[in-house]
A protein has these predicted regions:
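Alpha-helical transmembrane segments in inner-membrane proteins
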Residues: 1-362
Length: 362
């Protein structure tokens, strides 16, 4: 199988990268908590986390009055740490979805936006906020309706791509582009015709630009668990994902029918995007930039690409959230805006610096 090598190749470089990224993620998490309107020391952050974790295990370590309660403990444990953990989970999910969707359609420009999944989520959120669709579901109904929109659009993409024959990578892209345009048009239509308050319009805009401000431990742990399970699942599928880079004809000669796996992987990736949208709104560019960066550095083998992309996506979104909170004092920049502002120049730089094949002899 012709898989392109990156700048760093070989087993030692791969495992070294995994260890460095794991250590970097842990250190980034501790360091990032110190940033905000109230300055904190990393040592205090570590002691608060240590106390809270050991307290949950019924043998608290540390001074309960300093690290178990009070303003510092509340800021670390209930305000900053939850949204950073959410950033890790969402970053992993979006990077994984980008890797998988690019392999499914054999196109390095594919991401949740190209295949219409994000547009479906945006339409769902717009209908929930402006019309009240799904309001009977409770306080988190906007995220649930957005999740449903993402999933329904992914099903629609599969159905359209199978019209007139089996789904191919080109038909998936065309179906995704068409449904994405329809969802965007419907969203704009409702924004135009419905006489609603400025607050509702602001909520729609805020949702479509992404935010981690509503993070809580309940949703965070679910998001993180889904992302980790998704990474493990797709890592076990690296051989089939590598075959997708060769194309259908070559895969059939090797005894693998890619049609069924495209559907399975698209649904699984859509679930990852749906959970990310449910917890954080629409955040773009992560699923496009991170896989490109990893391919340039480590090649196109999905055995390496999947875990490294997941870790790098987590670190990228974690620090993006930090910048959102500290760039403008007293204001928070929507994280989707920042990922685009940071991601687009990085993407252009990487593409200008080194040309590389997508795999399969391209």
């Amino acid at each position: 199988m012709d898989l392109k090598n990156g700048v760093f190749h070989g087993r030692p470089a791969y495992w070294l990268a995994i260890l460095v990224l794991l250590a970097g993620l842990l250190l980034s998490l501790l360091w990032a908590v110190t940033f905000g309107s109230v300055d904190l020391k990393m040592g205090d952050v570590y002691r608060v986390i240590l106390y809270k974790v050991t307290e949950a295990l019924h043998f608290p370590v540390g001074d309960s009055e300093v690290y178990g309660s009070g303003s510092m403990s509340d800021i670390v444990w209930f305000v900053r740490l939850p949204r950073l953990v959410l950033a890790i989970g969402v970053g992993m999910a979006l990077a994984l979805a980008g890797v998988v969707m690019q392999a499914i359609v054999k196109n390095p420009l594919a991401d949740p936006y190209v295949l219409g999944v994000s547009s479906g989520a945006s339409l769902g959120a717009t209908l929930a906020i402006l019309v009240g669709v799904g309001s009977f579901l409770g306080s988190g109904y906007v995220g649930l309706v957005a999740f449903a929109g993402a999933f329904l659009v992914s099903m629609g993409v599969i159905a359209l791509a199978n019209i007139g024959g089996r789904a191919t990578s080109v038909k998936l892209i065309l179906a995704g582009t068409a449904l994405s345009a329809i969802c965007a048009a419907v969203s704009i239509f409702f924004l135009y015709v419905i006489n609603t308050s400025s607050g509702a319009l602001e909520a729609v805009v805020r949702w479509t630009m992404g935010s981690l401000a509503a993070a809580s431990w309940d949703t965070n742990l679910w998001m993180l668990a889904v992302s980790v399970l998704g990474a493990l699942f797709f890592w076990t599928q690296y051989r089939t994902l590598n075959l997708m880079l060769l194309g259908d004809e070559a895969a059939v000669t090797l005894g693998t029918d890619l049609h069924r796996w495209r559907i399975v992987y698209l649904l699984a990736a859509s679930l990852l995007v749906g959970f990310a949208v449910y917890t954080a709104g629409i955040i773009g560019f992560v699923g496009l930039v991170i896989p490109h960066m990893v391919r340039i550095l480590f090649g196109t083998d999905h055995k390496k690409l999947i875990p490294i992309s997941a870790l790098l996506g987590a670190i990228f979104l974690l620090w993006s959230d930090v910048l959102c909170r500290v760039v403008l004092p007293g204001k928070e920049i929507p994280i989707g805006v920042l990922t685009a502002l940071v991601g687009a120049p990085v993407f252009i730089y990487l593409m200008a610096r080194k040309k590389y094949g997508f795999g399969g002899g391209d």
